[in-house]
Regions:
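Non-transmembrane, aqueous-exposed alpha-helical and coiled segments at domain scale
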Residues: 1-214
């Protein structure tokens, strides 16, 4: 393995059970790049810095970042993959009609309200590599129907895009959080290292930032 294969090859071997072809390898690497970093504002990146600044070791700070992953941040991939896979044989219009009152995982973003650029980049990469992009196309169809029914745009977000790539590559939906963390932990380590190099004291909220309820 050490002589002949890359880290990406080993990810496929351990999580799918076989080695990838070159196109599969390229798409997974693109997905991992898309997930690695999206600004200090993300909970999985600033929380490790707070923990590191409090005097903790690298592994403790990294663990805090992992625990920051939840249904509202990085943790919707599994549900999005399950949703896309469960409904892939249905028409997008019928799916949205059935779930119009639900929060459909993998759609909508706090910042990218008109469209997540990471989603578009992964879709274009998959297309260029020759993948059928069945799950991407289904996701975009749901996006259009959501806009029709709700009157506002809820774009396929990065969680939905990662879900589409995972399914395209034949991975189990339950690996969603694992893939996000495989990528994100690199950025976590970078931020923790940077924090450890600072001479600042630990972070503490100012009294004006705390709302007291009487």
């Amino acid at each position: 393995l050490i002589e002949k294969h890359s880290f990406t090859d080993v990810i496929f071997l351990l999580l799918r059970g076989d080695f990838p072809n070159e196109k599969e390898k390229a798409l997974l690497e693109a997905m991992l790049v898309a997930s690695v970093e999206n600004g200090l504002e993300a909970p999985s990146l600033y929380i490790p810095r707070v923990v590191a600044a409090s005097g903790n070791d690298m592994h403790v700070a990294l663990a805090s970042g992992m625990l920051a992953i939840g249904s509202k941040h990085g943790g919707a991939v599994e549900k999005a993959a399950e949703f896309l896979n469960d409904h892939k044989e249905e028409r997008a219009e019928a799916v949205v009609e059935e779930h119009i009152k639900d929060v459909i995982p993998g759609f909508g973003h706090k910042i990218y309200k008109e469209g997540d650029p990471r989603t578009r980049a992964l879709y274009e990469k998959a297309k260029a590599l020759g993948f059928p992009c069945r799950f991407f196309d289904f996701g975009f169809a749901i996006e259009k129907e959501l806009e029709k029914k709700k009157g506002k745009k809820l774009p396929l977000n990065i969680d939905g895009a990662i879900a589409a790539v995972m399914l395209e590559l034949g991975f189990d939906a339950r690996l969603g959080k694992a893939f996000f963390l495989i990528s994100r932990i690199v950025a976590m380590a970078s931020h923790v290292k940077e924090e450890m190099e600072q001479k600042n004291s630990y972070y503490r909220l100012d009294e004006t930032e705390v709302q007291n309820e009487e």
